[in-house]
Amino acid sequence: MGLFNRSAGAQVTVAPAVVRPRQTVTATVTTDKPVDKVTAATLEWGYTNFYRYRWAGRADSTAVEMNDAWWLLGEVGTDAGSEKDTEDWVGVTKVDLPIATGEFTGATSSFTVPSWAPGSSDALARWSARLSVERGGRDIDTRGDFNVVISADNLHVSDEPQRRVGGDGETELEIILPSLVFRAGQPITGTIVLTPQKDMSDAELGVYWGYATLSHPLEKTPAAAGGYKSGDRLKLGKGIPLRYGAPVSVPFTLSLPADAPPTGSAVHSTLIWFVEASMLYAKWTQGIEKVRRQIVVVNA
């Protein structure tokens, strides 16, 4: 908990523990005994934003362009020695808590989660109510956490263009999905259509899910690639004939983890999901074709 671990007999409990944007939570602050010599007590609602930044040198134009383009994330290696994971507190609202004759004995405070709230996850944000008590002795700093879950109603969903991230397009790959929104723990289903622009060698086809975090800190230098994670590549077929004028449709089903972090945007970073299809030609000189299509993942 870093700085916020000096509880000194004070506890913060938030209920309900799981909430959606636009719903209200209440923090209850209790103390083992009255806290004396108090000059001020506050409770601040907000979230801790997790992100990466570049601590050495400056990000060049290529790195900045890559960070701005979600379809490039994970494609280019970065200098890991010059980038670090970090976190910053983003306060939303702060309230003064009552103190009487220099003593603090506890309080309650309610908070309505904003409509724009990013969902809780280890990849993006941790929501909390933070207690700070200033006193003549040792100050008290502690927190109570709660989880914000996200449904499709909480997000603006737009159909972003599919992007080619590898190959020359000798065979066009199109990822067709029944929906752009998928829920954590449920499968991602779809079809990949292969359309050769001329006769090509047979192909091996695979698909996987992935998510990336775009780094855009207010003050620090953005990391070149933010963060990136992908699922196992699902092999869909080998020896698939690629002949001009004969498109091939290949269905797929991917398992989405139950703890998949929801799509979201915070002050210092943004989390974006996608499905990527990759195809290898039997003749290695013909290379590889890769495309990505952005999706939205929710967990409520």
Cite the ranges covered by each PLM segment:
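C-terminal beta-sandwich interaction modules and adjacent acidic
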Residues: 1-300
